[in-house]
Amino acid sequence: MSGAVCPGSFDPVTLGHIDVFERASAQFDEVVVAVLVNPNKKGMFDLDERIAMIEESTTHLPNLRVESGQGLVVDFVKSRGLTAIVKGLRTGTDFEYELQMAQMNKHVAGVDTFFVATTPQYSFVSSSLAKEVASLGGDVSALLPSPVNRRLQEKLNG
């Protein structure tokens, strides 16, 4: 059985992330979305909210589950008996950074990383951009799953 981790902070999860999850889900028997905690970063959504939004947005993927994690992604992968990391790439800048991380993960723990080129319609989408546009009153419904857009609007409108 093959399994992979899709790691990230997902604050919040976007349709670009969901696209990567769907494509990973088609290639691996098991996919774990690892919602990572960065103690040095205060997000808009807390960990439980981020997990809930991903779960609500991925009910159509029966071989996917969502968990929280901290520390090295390779430790998360190994502790769950999984074999790979899947990362989406939007730009060449993403590739340069992620390639370096992939090589380190292979060196440190023997874990392979699979890169998924972003579907063109999502190549500009990021969590930060969606939050910024929404905070300025812009429509981000084409960037976020419906449950996420609803929660984002609730957060912003208090």
From Swiss-Prot:
The Gene Ontology terms for molecular function here are: ATP binding; pantetheine-phosphate adenylyltransferase activity
Per the record's keyword annotation, is Transferase included, yes or no?
yes
**Listed EC numbers:** 2.7.7.3
Show which residues form the site (Transition state stabilizer).
17
Primary location group: cytoplasm
Q: Where does ATP bind?
A: 9-10, 17, 88-90, 98, 122-128
Q: Which reaction does it catalyse?
A: (R)-4'-phosphopantetheine + ATP + H(+) = 3'-dephospho-CoA + diphosphate
Subcellular localization(s) per the UniProt record: Cytoplasm
UniProt-annotated binding residues for substrate: 9, 41, 73, 87
Q: Which cofactor does it need?
A: Mg(2+)
Which pathway, metabolic or otherwise, does it act in? Cofactor biosynthesis; coenzyme A biosynthesis; CoA from (R)-pantothenate: step 4/5
Recorded protein name is Phosphopantetheine adenylyltransferase
Taxonomic placement: Bacteria, Bacillati, Actinomycetota, Actinomycetes, Mycobacteriales
